[in-house]
Amino acid sequence: MTMLGALTGRQLSSGLKDQFDRYNRMDILGEGTYGVVYRAVDRATGQIVALKKVRLDRTDEGIPQTALREVSILQEIHHPNIVNLLDVICADGKLYLIFEYVDHDLKKALEKRGGAFTGTTLKKIIYQLLEGLSFCHRHRIVHRDLKPANILVTTDNSVKIADFGLARAFQIPMHTYTHEVVTLWYRAPEILLGEKHYTPAVDMWSIGCIFAELARGKVLFRGDSEIGQLFEIFQVLGTPMDAEGSWLGVSSLPDYRDVFPKWSGKPLTQVLPTLDGDAVDLLSQMLRYNPAERISAKAALQHPWFSDAMF
């Protein structure tokens, strides 16, 4: 077994030409820090797949930690609302991750729609996100980078959480993690304020931001810097106070300042007038300042907003 195989608990292919040649690359789907994602076809089955080519020159060991993390996590979790890792190939100095192919992500779906998601469609998407996330959290996985571009959507609005490169397994007590995670607009306030002992609640904040974005057709908190992001949040939810009913303990966070402007906030019903009472209630519980009071994915699935769901 290779080093990567030992780390992921799976025997990997090690440069066998026939294994690599099984996949015919068609076109580029995207490019990131560690490599390129292609649309490809499995010659053996005719199945369209997503082939992520990872460069192996980013660490002393050769394999980027984000790639190791993604492989090891996806080997542990299998769920209809989590993207399926089909194969792993290590060949020619590169690591290839073969995923099921889904032709849209939620960001593209929003752009194509040109407006908000409503009714059963919105409810189905949020429910599936919570199903996938609840499964992750039960298996002690915090995704840490939930955003529309990392959520795949099929033509029938089936949702699959993808891109686990930043994900970490969590234990109790919580480990100290870097706060440089999660795309700014979906980043939880405790991370923005320098908290390093964070919990799965950071994912629930991100889900709340995504929920609001789908419901209004545009980003809820659109900051252009960390402080700008905080102020965007404060203007909607009010500047948090270190007190019961707001965010007890917030003033002890490393980047909290007493001189923050004091905004009173505005009702979520005003920000999202198309949502009914149950939907606003669920969203408000996802966007609680205090992570200890933020609703969990498991509890959110039992919320009254889903009581009439027929999916």
UniProtKB/Swiss-Prot annotation:
The modification Phosphothreonine is found at residue 33. ATP binds at residues 29-37, 52. Its EC number is 2.7.11.22. The modification Phosphotyrosine is found at residue 34. The active site is at 145 (proton acceptor). Residues 23-306 form the Protein kinase domain. It comes from Trypanosoma brucei brucei. CDD domains: STKc_CDK_like. Probably involved in the control of the cell cycle. The keyword Oxidoreductase does not apply. One of its GO terms (biological process) is protein phosphorylation. GO terms for cellular component: cyclin-dependent protein kinase holoenzyme complex; cytoplasm; nucleus. This is Cell division control protein 2 homolog 3. It comes from the Eukaryota. Belongs to the protein kinase superfamily. CMGC Ser/Thr protein kinase family. CDC2/CDKX subfamily. The gene is CRK3. Keywords: ATP-binding, Kinase, Nucleotide-binding, Phosphoprotein, Serine/threonine-protein kinase, Transferase. Phosphorylation at Thr-33 or Tyr-34 inactivates the enzyme. It is an enzyme of class 2 (transferase). Forms a stable but non-covalent complex with a regulatory subunit and with a cyclin.
